[in-house]
């Protein structure tokens, strides 16, 4: 398993190479898409990218947690979190890739 992290710059480079836009235009396009995803989530809208994943905002209620160092209970305030649910197509691609590496 690799520990490579794909960055915005990496995505822009791929767009530049495969689409033929300049690097500046590619970076702007990647930024535009990511900003639109963020803005949709801030508005409380789900973002479904077919064959990839669904991002949703979920409300979490207040609950009692525990400080792992001291063991003291403390309230955890209510908040909104983003959830990521991988599409079955993505899950299958990852599984197939894993199986192919296991055979080597």
Swiss-Prot record:
UniProt protein name: Integration host factor subunit alpha
HAMAP family xrefs: IHF_alpha
Any Pfam family matching the protein: Bac_DNA_binding
Function: This protein is one of the two subunits of integration host factor, a specific DNA-binding protein that functions in genetic recombination as well as in transcriptional and translational control.
Quaternary structure and interacting proteins, as annotated: Heterodimer of an alpha and a beta chain.
NCBIfam families in the cross-refs: PRK00285.1 (NF001401)
Species this protein is from: Bartonella quintana (strain Toulouse)
Family per similarity comment: Belongs to the bacterial histone-like protein family.
UniProtKB keywords: DNA recombination, DNA-binding, Transcription, Transcription regulation, Translation regulation
InterPro entries with a match to the protein in the record: Hist_DNA-bd, Histone-like_DNA-bd_CS, IHF-like_DNA-bd_dom_sf, IHF_alpha
Upper lineage: Bacteria, Pseudomonadati, Pseudomonadota, Alphaproteobacteria, Hyphomicrobiales
One cellular component term from this protein's GO annotations in UniProt: cytosol
GO biological process, one term: regulation of DNA-templated transcription
GO terms assigned for molecular function: DNA binding; structural constituent of chromatin
């Amino acid at each position: 398993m690799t520990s490579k992290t794909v960055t915005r710059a990496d995505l822009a480079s791929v767009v530049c190479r495969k689409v033929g836009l300049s690097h500046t235009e590619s970076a702007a396009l990647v930024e535009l898409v990511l900003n639109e995803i963020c803005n949709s989530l801030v508005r409380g809208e789900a973002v479904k990218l077919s064959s990839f994943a669904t991002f949703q905002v979920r409300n979490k209620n207040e609950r009692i947690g525990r400080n792992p160092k001291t063991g003291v209970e403390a309230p955890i305030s209510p908040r909104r979190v983003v959830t990521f649910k991988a599409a079955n197509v993505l899950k299958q691609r990852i599984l197939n890739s894993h199986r192919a590496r296991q055979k080597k």
